[in-house]
């Protein structure tokens, strides 16, 4: 006689209770808003386009093209022509000087980064439907703007951030003027220059002009 099949034991299959943590995580807004990502992407693309228009560094450092200007007016003309030709290179050098000055002053760099992050994430790219709540108090956009202005005044004028930035920019301007005054521009093809609006720092205007309408419309 065939053996009987073993009895089937009942197996309980408890229903898993969905955790509320994922829903709470999903309900939180992303840190990087679409406007902020768009702003960063536009700045990145425009910086790449600006750097692609820089002149060869060997041409900038050509010692055979250096000569003493005949007069102050001649030096001014040279500075204007050389700046029009080496605009991207000059601004790159000035930016490098400012960056080096901030790196050698880490506290100033930290203060400046905190100030920039505060403006970006607490005001410019913060969703309007998410007010700032601190110590149980809700801050309006006007109060947030006032606090950021006071924080900016404190960082720039009551710390060494302002002096570091001003001294670095003065050094950069002095180097640019010295090179522009002693660099003879006779061998430069100035007729091939782009309009002044296409300079390296125009990404500030271009990126800001694209992001500003959305931010202003959201704040109004």
From Swiss-Prot:
Keywords: Endosome, Membrane, Transmembrane, Transmembrane helix, Transport. Residues 12-27 have a biased composition (Polar residues). Residues 1-27 are annotated as: Disordered. The keyword Ribosomal protein does not apply. GO terms for cellular component: endoplasmic reticulum; endosome; endosome membrane; Golgi apparatus; trans-Golgi network. InterPro entries: Prenylated_rab_accept_PRA1 (IPR004895). May be involved in both secretory and endocytic intracellular trafficking in the endosomal/prevacuolar compartments. This is PRA1 family protein B4. The lineage of its organism: Eukaryota, Viridiplantae, Streptophyta, Embryophyta, Tracheophyta.
